Curated annotation (Swiss-Prot):
Gene that this sequence comes from: atpF
Species: Saccharopolyspora erythraea (strain ATCC 11635 / DSM 40517 / JCM 4748 / NBRC 13426 / NCIMB 8594 / NRRL 2338)
TM region(s), chain numbering: 11-31
MF-aspect GO terms: proton-transporting ATP synthase activity, rotational mechanism; proton-transporting ATPase activity, rotational mechanism
HAMAP family in alphabetical order: ATP_synth_b_bprime
Name of the protein: ATP synthase subunit b
Length: 178
């Protein structure tokens, strides 16, 4: 059957169809180029500006965040330095308090030792005086018994006893130093 029609090929379009299709394509191309492409360009440009603005805003926000971070870091460093200074001051103050307490304890110790030595010296002097008086009375009583008479003359007796005790003390002092 195809052979009977004679030379018409269904794959190849008719020349009129090619011309109409070409005119319609050119008309569509003109309409798109005149109206649609400028709108697409405008939308594309607005979108590019928004993206660039967003990038600039993001960069500005990042720079602000970096400045804030640096501020926080410097404040943190200042706070650490302040804490270290306070710690050092507290240590120094504690050391000073310890030194003051030591000095007070040393002074109190020296005062107590001095008071004890003074009390001992006073007691020793009192005991020596009491022993001298007692020794003097006993010596007079013994001398009175040996002699057989009473040696009641107080002034003479005291002078003799005191002189004897002084000589005895003087004799024992070099012996105790040696």
């Amino acid at each position: 059957m195809l052979a009977a029609e004679g030379g018409h090929n269904p794959i190849i379009p008719e020349p009129v169809e090619i011309v109409v299709g070409l005119v319609a394509f050119l008309l569509l191309l003109f309409v798109l180029w005149k109206y649609a492409v400028p709108r697409f360009e405008k939308v594309y440009e607005e979108r590019s500006k928004r993206i660039e603005g967003g990038i600039e805003k993001a960069e500005a926000a990042q720079a602000e965040a970096q400045r804030t971070l640096e501020q926080y870091r410097s404040q943190l460093a200042e706070a650490r330095a302040e804490a270290a200074r306070i710690r050092d001051d507290a240590r120094a103050e504690g050391q000073q308090i310890v030194e003051e307490m030591r000095a007070q304890a040393q002074a109190e110790s020296e005062r107590i030792v001095s008071a004890g030595q003074s009390a001992l010296a006073a007691q020793r002097a009192q005991i020596v005086a009491e022993l001298r008086a007692d020794l003097g009375r006993q010596a007079v009583d013994l001398a009175g018994r040996v002699v057989g008479e009473s040696l009641e003359d107080e002034a003479r007796r005291r002078g003799t006893v005191d002189r004897f005790l002084d000589e005895l003390e003087a004799a024992s002092a070099p012996a105790s130093k040696a």
